[in-house]
Amino acid sequence: AYDLEALKALDIIVTCQGGDYTNEIYPKLRESGWQGYWIDAASSLRMKDDAIIILDPVNQDVITDGLNNGVKTFVGGNCTVSLMLMSLGGLFAQDLVEWVSVATYQAASGGGARHMRELLTQMGQLHHSVADELANPASAILDIERKVTQLTRSGELPVDNFGVPLAGGLIPW
């Protein structure tokens, strides 16, 4: 996957390796003069001028125009937006929707494997800290919640990727 010479021999590369891979390999390939098609699930290239977000039931005309005009980079869209457009795209096309206001709370999985591992580690530590109380039906739930909150605020949970504990709450962006 990191052998540039092998990759340069390909006409089409379809990758779901994540943003770190894309950020490392894609520019090197393009700088080497590679003219193939790059199809990527990562978010890294979504905002690039020479890339088209693909959601063919909604923007097939944009994809076709891009292919006809030499675009070689195609990327998947944000999962929330893609699902919304799949469900509402036809309504927009028929001019039946005037306005949509959306609020989403992105999942840890959007950050990739390291973020998911950190979240699961946090969850495990939180559970371990109150496992005995949870096993005892007579334990007061407010006492359990206080212990979880205390650990969350203690600075003892891993936060290398998120910067703050995600388990048990939301990141205040």
Features from the language model and the residues they span:
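Feature for intrinsically disordered/low-complexity regulatory segments and propeptides
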Residues: L166-L170
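N-terminal Rossmann-like NAD(P) cofactor-binding subdomain of oxidoreductases
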Residues: A1-D160
